[in-house]
A protein has these predicted regions:
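The Walker A (P-loop) glycine that initiates the GxxxxGKT/S ATP-binding motif of P-loop NTPases
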Residues: 221, 285, 307
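P-loop NTPase nucleotide-binding/switch module
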Residues: 170-209, 213, 240-295
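Walker B catalytic acidic pair
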Residues: 300, 306-307, 318
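Catalytic P-loop NTPase motifs of RecA-like helicase/translocase cores
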Residues: 111, 305-312, 355
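Peripheral, non-AAA+ core regions of ATP-driven protein-machinery
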Residues: 1-218, 222-225, 331, 477-478, ...
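Basic, amphipathic alpha-helical bundle interface domains used for macromolecular binding and assembly
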Residues: 33, 39-44, 59, 66-76, ...
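Walker A/P-loop
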Residues: 219-260, 325
């Protein structure tokens, strides 16, 4: 007897519907075909134990199972459930044709309980696309899978539950989640707020500009000056996630297995802060079964690299292409996996190895050569992709105790959203830009767009030229200054880029100054 069940293979964010064919004949062996990896091949032992421990007898026949299409590699343990149901159906335990209408995924424990799998959300999207009536998943994955509308999603605890449901037990009901209500309720619940930060108004302004234009930013200052504290509050002033952005971000976290049992849609922009000992694979993604790295987990959010020069040079250099393309392609011998990674890079660093170069309260013990070597750990091409360089000094305790609470994040966020709306309207008529997709903020402008949208007047251009000569700014700083100036103008509600906007943008290019290591902060 030949039986078919349906499941899915997840490669990156791409999902392929897999047909699980089970056939029985005389014999006592189990054969599994269809380019299955080790975890899938081991499924027979789990299935056998699960069937026996749930009161079923393993058929004493030759069982052949095929996972089609055979040219796509099948990885993970999510094929246990469809294989087990196929064996039960081929053995006459299924009394209906409901197997044809439902996709199912799940790992089986030896006791027959369903264990959670990765990628439940993209699998649910694929099930709806293929017009299945419903999807059966482990109960732990129910909230993320139930996000998909027009699809009946059932969360099951055991193999017996699945069999009873397929045989027509009507006591099982699909899970329904009010996605929009939950999404909007949680959007403004931030752990940190800028009102908690006293002082550092110039740095707050730089972060506001960065948030308004999607600019990458690096903060340079001594230990204890508040770099990490300020960075953690950046998500509270970024524009809220749209539902489309949230769905894309949630899919990435679903594939990586990072969603908690209570999560349906990610409602706030991700903030990822990996340790400086992180490896290349952990940062950009990879492995035998390529998983998303930190840059993809930060998609539509913030990647914070604390003590940036402490990361190995090779790790830093792999950031260059993702920062430009906003996606990462992981190549393997027989296939490629692509993950999106459109994130804001926020970095921090000390000004020197000891950390106190230019600090008024501590003496620096580093030589100019040591300082220069420390700064050179960040290459020119990588620094070229960071629009805003912001210097920061620690606020003395005597001043801290006298300062009033800072401006709340909600007020700053309103200005940021207004500036982003201006940019959205500006770029809405432009076609997609190659691999980067559609431009949606000033940081992504090309040279042609700079001439069209950020061309300064003659007086501003003369001031910029003079500043570049006197401050020894590099040539690569020119377009970065114009992009940041365009954002500052948007925050001010100005259609044109004026001298005051250029002047502020010039102040954000400290590390491009040729005399930086000799002058002190």
């Amino acid at each position: 007897m030949l039986v078919k069940t349906f499941c899915a293979a997840v490669n990156g964010l791409e999902v392929t519907t897999v047909t699980c064919e089970v056939s029985m004949s005389r014999g006592v062996q189990f054969h599994l075909t269809g380019l299955a990896d080790t975890a899938v091949k081991e499924s027979y032992d789990r299935i056998k134990a699960a069937l026996i421990n749930n009161g079923f007898k393993m058929p004493t026949m030759d069982i052949t199972a095929n996972l089609s299409p055979a040219d796509i590699k099948k990885e993970g343990s999510g094929y246990d459930l469809p294989l087990a149901m196929g064996i039960l159906a081929a053995n006459g335990k299924v009394e209906s044709d409901m197997l044809n209408h439902y996709m199912m995924v799940g790992e089986l424990g030896l006791d027959g309980r369903l264990q959670p799998i990765r990628g439940a959300l993209p699998i649910a999207i694929q099930a709806r696309k293929e017009k299945f009536k419903g999807l059966i998943v482990p109960k732990q994955n129910i909230r993320e899978a139930a996000v998909v509308n027009q699809l009946e999603v059932y969360g099951m605890e055991t193999l017996t539950d699945v069999l009873n449901f397929i045989n027509g037990d009507t006591s099982y009901q699909p899970t329904v989640i009010d996605t929009r209500r939950e999404f909007y309720e949680q959007q403004n619940q931030f752990e940190f707020d800028f009102s908690e930060v006293r002082g550092q108004e110039s740095v707050k302004r730089a972060l506001e500009v960065a948030a308004a234009g999607g600019h990458n930013l690096i903060m340079i200052g001594p230990p204890g000056s508040g770099k990490s504290m300020l960075a953690k509050r950046l998500p509270s002033i970024l524009p809220p996630l749209s539902l489309a952005e949230s769905l894309e971000t949630t899919q990435i976290h679903s594939v990586a297995g990072k969603l908690s049992r209570d999560t349906s849609l990610i409602s706030q922009r991700p903030f990822r802060a990996p340790h400086h000992t992180i490896s290349q694979v952990a940062l950009v993604g990879g492995g035998n079964n390529p998983q998303p790295g930190e840059i993809s987990l930060a998609h539509n959010g913030v990647l914070f690299l604390d003590e940036m020069p402490e990361l190995s040079r090779s790790v830093l250099e792999v950031l260059r292409q993702p920062l430009e393309d906003r996606k990462i392609t992981i190549s393997r011998a027989k296939y490629n996996v692509e993950y999106p990674c459109s994130f804001m890079l926020i970095a921090s660093m000390n000004p020197c190895p000891c950390g106190y170069y230019g600090d008024p309260t501590h003496n620096c013990v580093c030589t100019p050569g040591q300082i220069q070597r420390y700064m050179n750990k960040i290459s020119g091409p990588l620094l070229d992709r960071i629009d805003i360089h912001c210097e920061i000094q620690a606020v003395p305790f005597a001043q801290l105790s006298q300062m009033q609470p800072g401006e709340p994040s909600a007020s700053i966020r309103e200005r940021v959203i207004k500036a982003r709306n201006i940019q959205t309207e500006r770029f809405s008529f432009l076609p997609k830009q190659g691999v980067s997709g559609r431009v949606h903020c000033n940081a992504q402008m090309t040279e042609r767009m700079l001439h069209e949208f950020a061309e300064p007047d003659t007086a501003s251009l003369d001031m910029l030229r003079l500043a570049m000569e006197r401050l020894k700014l590099s040539a690569r700083a020119y377009s970065r200054i114009l992009k940041v100036a365009r954002t500052i103008a948007d925050l001010a509600g100005s259609e044109k880029v004026e001298s005051v906007h250029i002047a502020e943008a010039i102040g954000y290019r400290n590390l491009d100054r040729g005399d930086w290591a000799e002058r002190g902060i």
